[in-house]
């Protein structure tokens, strides 16, 4: 059964910051479902697709333990409340880039997430999230730095540069701000993952399936997070997948490594000889003299060269005296990594055969 099912069994919004979904994935071969569910669960928990506040500058606060006049919360409590804020970005948000937000409120007032002035590409998931409380005739001024950290996303190719004069001057001013308070960010939008195995006795050889439950903070739906996680795993293994193994035909499994190394060596030699084909043909016509055809049968082993010299020549598929003669020594020295000292030794050995490669 090659086709696998990926279906959503249940999905509900249990709160403004609690999105729950349950999925069915399978069926799989025996003992494979546990492996796949464990890998997928770990990838989901390592998600980093959220956009969060990473640094804050509070007017009147020198450090995180400072007390703000007229504000019920301390600087530390204020940072913890800002850390809990959930934001969502649209497809025009640039990833791995900093954005800036601003807050200025006068008391008496209860400050919520809706009071923050955000960039036009970032929105608050829950605008009623509590931040602080200000008493009479007091004010609270904040400058916040938001960072979007997303390495794998379906919309990463749709990041357009916004030509807004207001955003240009606003970001230019805020980038020069010294943010003294740093927040430990949590870029994950996945709150919880639970996986279990379902046994199906009515399917032959395919008797295990995965029941996957995912809770997010509503910045992304669980389905999108799962698809992004699967895509990131596929891209990871494709980047280290070697297609050269496909062309290897093995007659004996004991010679697997040896045959693979020979295949790589032949492929490198093919590219080099194809690339320098014109150069070698030109040098062959220019320097070719009367050449005894019987010399084409002479192996380079009969030249009495050093073991290292023979190794360099054979590595580039130069096996006979004719193969050595038709390649210019400048090409040998420059592109085949054969040293000048080795070339001198080869020329001395070729003198007795009545030909020298110039």
From Swiss-Prot:
Region feature (Alpha C-terminal domain (alpha-CTD)): 287-358
Listed EC numbers: 2.7.7.6
Entry's free-text remark on domains: The N-terminal domain is essential for RNAP assembly and basal transcription, whereas the C-terminal domain is involved in interaction with transcriptional regulators and with upstream promoter elements.
Record-level GO cellular component terms: chloroplast; DNA-directed RNA polymerase complex; mitochondrion
Compartment(s): Plastid, Chloroplast
Domain of life: Eukaryota
Organism, as annotated: Bigelowiella natans
Recorded family membership: Belongs to the RNA polymerase alpha chain family.
Sequence segments annotated as region (Alpha N-terminal domain (alpha-NTD)): 1-244
Catalytic activity annotation: RNA(n) + a ribonucleoside 5'-triphosphate = RNA(n+1) + diphosphate
Descriptive protein name: DNA-directed RNA polymerase subunit alpha
Swiss-Prot/TrEMBL keywords: Chloroplast, DNA-directed RNA polymerase, Nucleotidyltransferase, Plastid, Transcription, Transferase
Task of the protein: DNA-dependent RNA polymerase catalyzes the transcription of DNA into RNA using the four ribonucleoside triphosphates as substrates.
Major localization class: plastid
InterPro entries from the UniProt entry: DNA-dir_RNA_pol_insert, DNA-dir_RNA_pol_RpoA/D/Rpb3, RBP11-like, RNAP_asu_C, RNApol_insert_sf
GO molecular function: DNA binding; DNA-directed RNA polymerase activity; protein dimerization activity
Record text on subunit structure and interactions: Homodimer. The RNAP catalytic core consists of 2 alpha, 1 beta, 1 beta' and 1 omega subunit. When a sigma factor is associated with the core the holoenzyme is formed, which can initiate transcription.
Keyword Transferase: yes
Tagged with keyword rRNA processing: no
SUPFAM superfamilies the record matches: C-terminal domain of RNA polymerase alpha subunit (SSF47789), Insert subdomain of RNA polymerase alpha subunit (SSF56553), RBP11-like subunits of RNA polymerase (SSF55257)
GO annotation terms (biological process): DNA-templated transcription
């Amino acid at each position: 059964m090659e086709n696998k099912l990926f279906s959503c069994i249940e999905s509900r919004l249990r709160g403004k910051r609690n999105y729950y979904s349950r999925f069915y994935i399978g069926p799989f071969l025996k003992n494979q479902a546990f492996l796949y569910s464990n890998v997928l669960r770990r990838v989901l928990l390592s998600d980093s697709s959220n956009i969060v506040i990473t640094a804050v500058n509070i007017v009147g606060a020198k450090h995180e333990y400072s007390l703000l006049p007229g504000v019920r919360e301390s600087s530390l409590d204020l940072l913890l409340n800002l850390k809990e804020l959930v934001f969502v970005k649209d497809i025009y948000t640039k990833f791995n880039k900093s954005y800036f937000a601003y807050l200025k409120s006068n008391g008496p007032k209860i400050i919520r997430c809706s009071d923050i002035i955000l960039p036009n590409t970032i929105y608050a998931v829950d605008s009623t999230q509590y931040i602080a409380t200000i008493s009479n005739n007091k004010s609270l001024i904040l400058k916040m730095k938001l960072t979007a950290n997303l390495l794998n996303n379906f919309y990463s190719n749709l990041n357009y540069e916004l030509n807004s004069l207001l955003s240009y001057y606003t970001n230019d001013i805020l980038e020069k701000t010294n943010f003294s308070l740093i927040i430990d960010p949590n870029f994950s939008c996945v709150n919880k993952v639970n996986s279990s195995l379902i046994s199906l006795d009515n399917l032959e050889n395919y008797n295990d399936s995965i029941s996957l439950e995912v809770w997010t903070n509503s910045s992304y739906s669980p389905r999108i997070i799962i698809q992004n996680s699967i895509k990131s795993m596929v891209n990871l293994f494709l980047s280290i997948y070697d297609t050269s193994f496909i062309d290897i035909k093995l007659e004996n499994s004991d010679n697997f490594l040896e045959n693979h190394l020979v295949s790589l060596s032949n492929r490198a030699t093919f590219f080099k000889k194809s690339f320098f084909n014109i150069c070698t043909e030109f040098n062959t016509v220019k320097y070719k003299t009367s050449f005894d055809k019987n010399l084409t049968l002479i192996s380079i082993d009969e030249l009495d060269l050093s073991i290292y010299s023979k190794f360099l020549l054979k590595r580039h598929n130069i096996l006979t005296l004719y193969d050595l003669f038709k390649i210019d020594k400048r090409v040998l020295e420059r592109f085949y990594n054969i040293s000048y000292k080795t070339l001198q030794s080869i020329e001395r050995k070729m003198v007795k055969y009545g030909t020298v490669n110039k």
